[in-house]
């Protein structure tokens, strides 16, 4: 089967390699022994390969894409990944709320995950076209989905400017966008208390695990690949702490 390599996820000294078959099937390519590949694997993002593989005997949801790779033959590098992908799959489009069936929850540090409690999606990989920028955090390891609401289509670049508008237009609440601009959100009250309450802006993020160096901003409308990490919980966690699959960004096209 012809397979486009769409991701190489960093895993210490190994790589979790993702592929998209010519029939639109999403694959997580494991070695014939069921392990992740070495960093020296010749399977590189953007390359087309002719692969022979078989599904593993037993998978643990949501990681239904696991296959055992038996043979590989290089085919081509003259592939346009975005075009290839969009011809075969229908990506999620719009808000981050739409990915993985809306089952993603977020930690206090704004990192997305799923758990048995929140519900397990029917897959662990997917493509997404976000309606807002994804901005790199200062840690250089996570991206945040930058929600922007323009209910009335008015922008304000300073709090004072926004507050003056709120005073002149009773019933307007003001909330700050992550990039520092102010937007009118909805009609409720013009009080200072309401303005202060709306001063916070919840971020929702995901870890970047691709090999390519991260960029500061992935613009809205960019096709990106998402995945859910294997089930995990910290070794030093409480006995009743739930296992989770954390949300990851594999790359963009």
Where do the PLM segments sit?
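Generic alpha-helical propensity signal that fires on short helical segments
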Residues: 46, 67-69, 87
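Short, charged amphipathic alpha-helical surface segments
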Residues: 71-81
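Generic "edge-of-domain/loop-turn" microfeature
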Residues: 10, 24-26, 58, 74, ...
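Nucleic-acid-binding small beta-barrel platforms of the OB/S1 family
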Residues: 1, 56, 80-253
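Surface-exposed beta-strand edges and their flanking turn/coil or helix-capping segments
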Residues: 32, 42-44, 64-66, 239-240
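N-terminal ordered "arm"
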Residues: 1-54
């Amino acid at each position: 089967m012809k397979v486009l390599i769409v991701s190489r996820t960093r895993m210490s000294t190994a790589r979790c390699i993702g592929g998209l078959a010519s029939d639109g099937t999403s694959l997580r390519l494991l070695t014939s022994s069921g392990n992740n590949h070495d960093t020296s694997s010749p399977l590189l993002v953007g390359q087309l390969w002719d692969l022979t593989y078989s599904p593993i005997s037993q998978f643990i949801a949501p990681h239904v894409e696991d296959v055992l790779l038996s043979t590989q033959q290089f085919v081509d590098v003259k592939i346009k990944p975005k075009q290839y992908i969009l011809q075969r799959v229908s990506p999620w489009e719009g808000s981050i709320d739409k990915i993985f069936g809306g089952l993603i929850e977020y930690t206090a540090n704004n990192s997305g995950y799923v758990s048995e409690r929140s519900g397990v999606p029917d897959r662990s990989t997917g493509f997404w076209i976000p309606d807002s920028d994804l901005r790199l955090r200062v840690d250089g390891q996570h991206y945040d989905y930058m929600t922007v609401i323009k209910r009335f289509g008015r922008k304000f670049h300073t709090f004072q400017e926004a507050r003056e508008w709120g005073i002149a237009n009773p019933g307007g609440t003001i909330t700050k966008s992550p990039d520092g601009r102010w937007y009118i959100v909805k009609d409720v009250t013009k009080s200072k208390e309401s303005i202060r309450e709306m001063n916070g802006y919840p971020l929702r993020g995901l870890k970047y695990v691709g090999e390519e160096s991260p960029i500061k901003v992935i613009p809205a409308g960019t096709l990106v690949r998402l995945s859910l990490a294997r089930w995990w919980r910290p070794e030093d966690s409480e006995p009743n702490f739930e296992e989770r699959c954390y949300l990851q960004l594999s790359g963009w096209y």
